[in-house]
Design a protein with these regions (language model features):
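Active-site-adjacent helix-turn-beta-strand microarchitecture at beta-sheet edges
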Residues: 1-50, 78-79, 104
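His/Asp/Glu-enriched, well-ordered alpha-helical/loop segment
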Residues: 42-52, 59-91, 96, 101-105, ...
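Extracellular/periplasmic ectodomains of large secreted or surface enzymes and adhesion receptors
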Residues: 260-261
Length: 261
């Protein structure tokens, strides 16, 4: 059940704590009041739906976490047991592009999954510092920091806004570069994610986000045999080549559904 808390960095409508560096006086917008967002999310949560909230700016993230906490507290007041709450699908925070250390500490205590779109960075890295300032740019797209904090990230594309090609998404996660390999070494390379963790983001973590971790996401006995065969070993090629990976075969439930000629 999707909601929107704010806009985007490109349009300067993502809600920030302070002014945009290139637009003094503008902190972006909340597209829904904090109170209404919390009530909307709780209505979905109470009826067994999975709340998923678009959230890009740091202030929008704070408002969204407030709403998650409200849902959990209100659920207890309405008779839900902690055990019942633990069985619910995790709250999904879509994008989570900016986060302060304080917000990350709050997220560590909540049943959430971060829906990350790494390909956003391939475009944004060219102007993000000008848009939000160097200090906040350091706090943007902090994937390794999220990982080190124990947060679960599920990789996505936001297609058709960006390419749906997962190999490009994994490439962006691992290199933090655009398609031309800019910047050399990657944008804030301390936030790079390993190839293994990036693959997990696009497989097992997505299954977890959907509540399907017992059915898919890893190749194990008893799970659906949904898998692909690719033309090179992603763990033993130069990182720059990841974006060029091609699928040779696609299997669903163990049946070949695609074969590349």
């Amino acid at each position: 059940f999707k909601s929107f808390s704010d806009g985007s960095l490109g349009s300067r409508s993502a809600k920030l704590y302070t002014d945009y560096a290139d637009d003094p006086g503008n902190t972006g917008i909340l597209v829904i009041s904090p109170e209404d967002l919390a009530k909307r999310m709780y209505k979905a949560y109470r009826h067994g739906l999975q709340p998923a909230t678009h959230c890009i700016g740091d202030k929008a993230l704070e408002v969204t976490l407030d709403a998650v906490e409200y849902c959990l507290q209100q659920g207890l007041k309405d008779g839900m047991t902690p055990e019942e709450q633990a069985k619910r699908l995790p709250f999904r925070i879509i994008h989570a592009q900016m986060a302060t250390p304080e917000l990350i500490e709050r997220m560590k205590k909540l049943p959430i999954v971060l829906d990350i779109q790494p390909t956003f960075l391939m475009t944004d890295l060219h102007w993000i510092e000008e848009r939000v300032g160097k200090e906040r740019a350091v706090l943007s797209y902090p994937w390794k920091t999220y990982l080190d904090a124990g947060l679960i990230m599920a990789g996505g594309s936001d297609a058709p806004v960006e390419s749906f090609n997962p190999w490009i998404g994994i490439y962006a996660t691992v290199t933090r570069q655009d398609m031309d390999g800019y910047p050399v070494g990657g944008y804030h390379p301390n936030e790079k994610v390993s190839v293994y963790d990036a693959v997990c983001m696009y497989s097992k973590n997505v299954a977890y986000a959907n509540g399907d971790q017992d059915l898919m996401g890893t190749i194990e006995a008893g799970k659906f045999a949904d898998m692909v065969v690719i033309d090179r070993d992603i763990f033993h090629i130069p990182e720059n080549d990841i974006k060029d990976i091609q699928v040779l075969n696609t299997y669903m439930a163990g049946i070949e559904r695609y074969h590349r000629d």
